[in-house]
Amino acid sequence: MTIDRTYPIFTVRWLAIHGLAVPTVSFLGSISAMQFIQR
């Protein structure tokens, strides 16, 4: 029972971290790409 309660919390936390990290990396990548294109 302990593993069943801990696993979903870890999964939600993992999804939340990646859900915030992926758009941030793509956003920074798009900004750097636009700066290189302007130059």
Swiss-Prot record:
It is a single-pass membrane protein. The gene is psbF. Its main location: plastid. It comes from Allium textile (Textile onion). GO terms for biological process: photosynthetic electron transport chain. The chain crosses the membrane at residues 14-30. This is Cytochrome b559 subunit beta. Belongs to the PsbE/PsbF family. GO terms for cellular component: chloroplast thylakoid membrane; photosystem II reaction center.
